From Swiss-Prot:
InterPro entries: CemA. It catalyses: K(+)(in) + H(+)(out) = K(+)(out) + H(+)(in). Contributes to K(+)/H(+) antiport activity by supporting proton efflux to control proton extrusion and homeostasis in chloroplasts in a light-dependent manner to modulate photosynthesis. Prevents excessive induction of non-photochemical quenching (NPQ) under continuous-light conditions. Indirectly promotes efficient inorganic carbon uptake into chloroplasts. The gene is cemA. The keyword Ion transport applies. PANTHER family: CHLOROPLAST ENVELOPE MEMBRANE PROTEIN, CHLOROPLAST ENVELOPE MEMBRANE PROTEIN-RELATED. It comes from Lactuca sativa. It is a multi-pass membrane protein. The chain crosses the membrane at residues 7-27, 107-127, 189-209. Pfam families: CemA. This is Potassium/proton antiporter CemA. It is found in: Plastid, Chloroplast inner membrane. Keywords: Antiport, Chloroplast, Hydrogen ion transport, Ion transport, Membrane, Plastid, Plastid inner membrane, Potassium, Potassium transport, Transmembrane, Transmembrane helix, Transport.
Length: 229
C-alpha cells in the first residue's frame, strides 16, 4: 500500500511531463491536413494584402527590379523576356507557398501550446493531492541540504538567470519559445524581452531574500552574501 502511494505521485509527475507533449504532437499531426486545407481555401484571397514578412517583401522587390532591368535591355528577344516573366511568376508562387506554410505552422503550434496549457491547468486542479505529496518531497530534500549547498545553488541559479552572461541564454530561450509558437523572429521584441526579464527576476529575487529567507534562514542569507561578495 505504501509503495502504491509512493508510485502514484511519480506516475503523476511523468504524465505531467510526457502526456501534454504526446497529445499536442498527436493533435498537430492529425489537424495539419485540415488546417492546411482551411487556410488555402479560406485565406487565399486576402494573402497579397497581408504580407508582413520583410524577407518576402524584399524578394518581391528584387523580382520586380529584375523584370524592369531585363525589359530595358533591348538585345534580349521576346521569347527570353517571356521566359523571364514565367520564372518570376513561379518565384512569386513559391514565395506565397512559403508564406502560407509559415502561417499554417503558426496556427498549429499556437493551438498545440494552448492545448498543453489547458492540460497542465487541468492536472493542477484535479491532481491537488499528488502535487501536495510532490511538494512535501521537494521541501524534505531541500531541508536536508546544508546551508552551504543551498547558498551555492542559489548563487549558481542567479548567475545563470541574471548574471553577466545570462542575456545570451535568455536570447536563446526566448527565441526557442518564439519558434515553438510559430512566430516570426523579431529582433526588436526579443531584445526588449532579454533586457527586461533579468531585471524583473533580479528584483523579485532580492525581494524574496529580504522577505522570506531573512526570516526563515538568516544563516543561509549570510553565507549567500559572503559567496556573492
Amino acid at each position: 500500500m505504501e509503495k502504491k502511494k509512493a508510485f502514484t505521485p511519480l506516475l503523476y509527475l511523468a504524465s505531467i511531463i510526457f502526456l501534454p507533449w504526446w497529445i499536442s504532437l498527436s493533435f498537430q499531426k492529425s489537424m495539419e491536413s485540415w488546417v492546411t486545407n482551411w487556410w488555402n481555401t479560406r485565406q487565399s484571397e486576402p494573402f497579397l494584402n497581408d504580407i508582413e514578412e520583410k524577407s518576402i517583401l524584399e524578394k518581391f522587390i528584387e523580382l520586380e527590379e529584375l523584370l524592369f532591368l531585363e525589359e530595358m535591355i533591348k538585345e534580349y528577344s521576346e521569347t527570353h523576356l517571356q521566359n523571364l516573366r514565367i520564372g518570376i511568376h513561379k518565384e512569386t508562387i513559391q514565395l506565397i507557398k512559403i508564406h502560407n506554410e509559415g502561417r499554417i505552422h503558426t496556427i498549429l503550434h499556437f493551438s498545440t501550446n494552448i492545448i498543453c496549457f489547458i492540460i497542465l491547468s487541468g492536472y493542477s486542479l484535479l491532481g491537488n493531492k499528488e502535487l501536495v505529496i510532490l511538494n512535501s518531497w521537494v521541501q524534505e530534500f531541500l531541508y536536508n541540504l546544508s546551508d552551504t549547498i543551498k547558498a551555492f545553488s542559489l548563487l549558481l541559479l542567479t548567475d545563470l538567470c541574471i548574471g553577466f552572461h545570462s542575456p545570451h541564454g535568455w536570447e536563446l530561450m526566448i527565441g526557442f519559445v518564439y519558434k515553438d509558437f510559430g512566430f516570426v523572429h523579431n529582433e526588436q521584441i526579443i531584445s526588449g524581452l532579454v533586457s527586461t526579464f533579468p531585471v524583473i527576476l533580479d528584483t523579485i529575487f532580492k525581494y524574496w531574500i529580504f522577505r522570506y529567507l531573512n526570516r526563515v534562514s538568516p544563516s543561509l542569507v549570510v553565507i549567500y552574501h559572503s559567496m556573492n561578495d
